[in-house]
Each structure stands twice: as structure tokens, then as C-alpha cells.
Amino acid sequence: MIPVERRQIILEMVAEKGIVSIAELTDRMNVSHMTIRRDLQKLEQQGAVVLVSGGVQSPGRVAHEPSHQVKTALAMTQKAAIGKLAASLVQPGSCIYLDAGTTTLAIAQHLIHMESLTVVTNDFVIADYLLDNSNCTIIHTGGAVCRENRSCVGEAAATMLRSLMIDQAFISASSWSVRGISTPAEDKVTVKRAIASASRQRVLVCDATKYGQVATWLALPLSEFDQIITDDGLPESASRALVKQDLSLLVAKNE
């Protein structure tokens, strides 16, 4: 049986069962564990499946972005750990970008005492928090307002970002996989691509609960990022897949 035939069978089994173990696949196709792993890694790179401990499953699909209020109650411990680790990478006197989101808000909460810092953001909550609690210089992108996420999106925000020179961009996402970060909102894509182009260093900050999720629009491939910061809930198989792509992975320990 040639690889393309095996991979088609894998996709059919995953579609039927949702989650399939590696043992089931080796028995079904009478091939080695290593052969199946190579097939699964290829399918995961294509975004067709997600590797989990001992098996494989279909990628979850994000149909819409949760509101800011909903996101504040999700993965709070993980976001706090990621925020603390990410903030430790910021140097005094630098110009950084904090993407819209509650994970990046957690970064802001660890930066309030840093001297001579410039923070660019498209997030009203982050800007408001830093305005009340820090002495840093704040630059808001402006643009079309997304009420649900209390942030600015679209071409006007992207155009503003293209006029800046950013040292570090901390970029968030509602879904990510080995293919990259994706979003159900097309007007967020142009903003993420603009900040990626405007920044000297690009850091993805995303908790492990969002790994293996996909949405309609691929915003950025993982190859665009210099570092990825996530939490220790990321499956070992996912860590291996990311490291295999020569991606720099930092894992924040949940406290």
C-alpha cells in the first residue's frame, strides 16, 4: 500500500471515529508504528489531523471568536503563566506590540514597572489598563472597532502598524496548529500580517487549549514566528512536531 492510500484510510477512520489510536492504524494497515507516525506527521503538517497522546484526531473548528468577557474566564492560570514568561523577555527602552487578547493583557500586567517602555496595541482593554497602572508610552492603532473583542481591526489598523518599527510583537490567536494561526474573522488577518512585517521579533503567545483548533482564515504560518510561548498542557506529540520544524518553543509552567 502506497503512502497516499494509507493517508486516505487514516482520514476516513478519523472522520468516522473522531479519535483513532496508532495501534488501530498499524493493525488496520499492517505496517510499522514508525510508518504510521510518518503518515500522521505529514497529515498534521497539512492541517488535516491533530496528533494526540497515542493517536490522532480531527482538528476542531472555531466558528467565531469568543467575546472579551468570555475569554477572561478561559484558561486563566495558563494565561497568567504565559504572560509572566513573555514579559521576562521584554527589555527596558524597547518598543513592543501587544495584540488584542486576554493572554497579551496578562503580559501587560507584568510590565507596569518597566522603565522607558513603548507599547503599541490594537486592544482598548490593554491600553486602558496601562494608562491607569503604568508610565509607559502607549500607542493605539485605531481602526474599525470590533465591539465583541474591544479592539481595532481592518486595513486602517494595519496601515498604521506598517508605519512603525517594532522590536517585539506578542501575537495571540484563537486557534493554532502546526500549519499556523488562524481566525474566523477576515478583518483580523491583515492586522496580524502587518505587525509581523513591522516587527524585528515575532512571538506567538497562545495557551495549549487552543492547539489543534482551526478557523477559516490562515493568518500566519508558524514559520513567521521567532518564538512560541505556550503552557505545559501542550501534548508531547505536539511539542515534538513543533521542534521538528525548528521552531523555538518556550513552555510556561502552570502555577
UniProtKB/Swiss-Prot annotation:
Q: Which InterPro entries match?
A: Carb_Metab_HTH_regulators (IPR050313), DeoR-like_C (IPR014036), DeoR_HTH (IPR001034), HTH-type_regulator_YgbI-like (IPR053533), NagB/RpiA_transferase-like (IPR037171), Tscrpt_reg_HTH_DeoR_CS (IPR018356), WH-like_DNA-bd_sf (IPR036388), WH_DNA-bd_sf (IPR036390)
State the Pfam families in the record: DeoRC, HTH_DeoR
Query: Which PROSITE patterns did the record assign?
Result: HTH_DEOR_1, HTH_DEOR_2
Would the keyword Transit peptide turn up in this protein's UniProt record?
A: no
All copies of the HTH deoR-type domain together span: 3-58
**Database matches in SMART domains:** DeoRC (SM01134), HTH_DEOR (SM00420)
Q: Does the keyword Oxidoreductase apply?
A: no
* UniProt KW keywords: DNA-binding, Transcription, Transcription regulation
Query: SUPFAM superfamilies, per this entry?
Result: NagB/RpiA/CoA transferase-like, Winged helix' DNA-binding domain
Q: Name one GO molecular function term.
A: ligand-modulated transcription factor activity
Can you name this protein?
A: Uncharacterized HTH-type transcriptional regulator YgbI
Task: Print the organism lineage.
Answer: Bacteria, Pseudomonadati, Pseudomonadota, Gammaproteobacteria, Enterobacterales
